[in-house]
């Protein structure tokens, strides 16, 4: 499993090095990672992804602080947009206020009072195996509790891409104290992820 995660991290690094910047301000730099895929790198070293299909687009995570994120996304794509948070921590869901509807896993609703109590929009709940069909491109939800109870990864199986938030990929095991996730839960998610990567 460590070998697979290392390969994934190296591939991501190689793609990021060759990325072309399409937008930059003091809070975020947006780069074209590959065709119809942009990475948003923020001042606090978190990342968001914009994935575009033929019919619509998906923004994965919203970062901590990025003024007018909706307008920045609108400069890149004019397609209807779905917004998904990989988990309900402020560095991944801090700018949900710019969007009327946000997809999250129901298990992370325990974090909403602490991290998104002021959100005026609507939460939509995604489930294991749910597919977001963008037109010519699909993202499948895989529930990976551990970092938070509702952590998810999004798999673009056709292109071999995985968008994991903080569930995996940082090189560290980062479990949270409140709410506490048993190490066994994280281990189960690691085993499931390893199977998905094969």
Residue spans for each PLM region:
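Conserved beta-strand hairpin/beta-sheet module of binuclear metal-dependent hydrolase folds
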Residues: 24-75, 153-166
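Short, hydrophobic/aromatic-rich segments at coil-to-beta transitions
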Residues: 34-39, 129, 138-140
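Metallo-beta-lactamase
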Residues: 57, 64-65, 138-198
């Amino acid at each position: 499993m460590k070998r697979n995660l290392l390969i994934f991290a190296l591939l991501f690094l190689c793609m990021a090095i060759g990325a072309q910047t399409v937008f930059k301000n003091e809070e975020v730099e947006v780069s074209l990672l590959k065709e119809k895929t942009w990475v948003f790198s923020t001042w606090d070293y978190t990342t968001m992804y914009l994935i575009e299909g033929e019919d619509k687009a998906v923004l994965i995570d919203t970062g901590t602080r990025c003024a007018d994120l909706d307008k920045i996304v609108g400069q890149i794509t004019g397609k209807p947009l779905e917004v998904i948070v990989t988990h309900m921590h402020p560095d991944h869901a801090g700018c949900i206020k710019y969007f009327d509807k946000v997809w999250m896993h129901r298990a992370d609703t325990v974090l909403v009072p602490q991290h998104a109590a002021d959100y005026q929009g609507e939460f939509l709940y995604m489930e294991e195996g749910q597919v977001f069909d963008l037109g010519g491109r699909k993202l499948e939800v895989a529930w990976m509790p551990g970092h938070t109870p509702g952590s998810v990864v999004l798999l673009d199986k056709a292109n071999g891409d995985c968008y994991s938030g903080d569930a995996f990929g940082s090189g560290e095991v980062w479990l949270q104290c409140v709410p506490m996730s048993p190490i066994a839960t994280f281990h189960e998610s690691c085993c499931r992820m390893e199977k998905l990567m094969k």
